[in-house]
């Protein structure tokens, strides 16, 4: 077997100590082009970065730790800022950040999360999370297969959305044509609508 299990803390460096939180009010005077990351991704843009490179970010607290309504782990690359609601990691041994990101997003971490009203994945527990590690070539192939699968899903979603819009348009068109008398041939020998209304009026009076 070429795979093994190892704790996340043994293959990563943690950079949480370099994070700097800035509240929304103070960010008003710092507007700029650099992404400002929180637990679930970009929440603002500021005028200077505190990180420059490629990092793995993992949400530290909040409801998303349980609900997973958006990815818990994601890649930040280039120049950016991170607040104290996302752990920030780099890896050892050329292990691709994408490999770890995809793994973290594929498993439930309930065992490592503390708190109920305010769920939290603290740094010590983060380091203890077991991760399956394969040879680098296999890791790269896994990443490729996942990306291709996600791309297929996205294309299918786009096609499905387009078809649903077309169905809505067709539905409206059919109703419109139906009540304009365009779905059935017009027979001059048929009694007119006026004649029908006269008959209804007579029936009501009788």
What is each PLM-predicted segment?
Residues 1-20, 27-38, 128, 136-140, ...:
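Non-catalytic DNA-recognition/assembly elements of restriction-modification systems
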Residues 1-6, 86-96, 110-111, 124-144, ...:
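Proline-centric
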Residues 16-20, 60-61, 205:
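Alpha-helix capping/hinge segments and adjacent helical runs
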Residues 22-29, 114-118, 187-190:
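Short coil/turn segments at secondary-structure boundaries
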Residues 38-40, 48-105, 114-126:
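A short beta-sheet element
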Residues 130-206:
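Amphipathic alpha-helical coiled-coil/heptad-repeat segments
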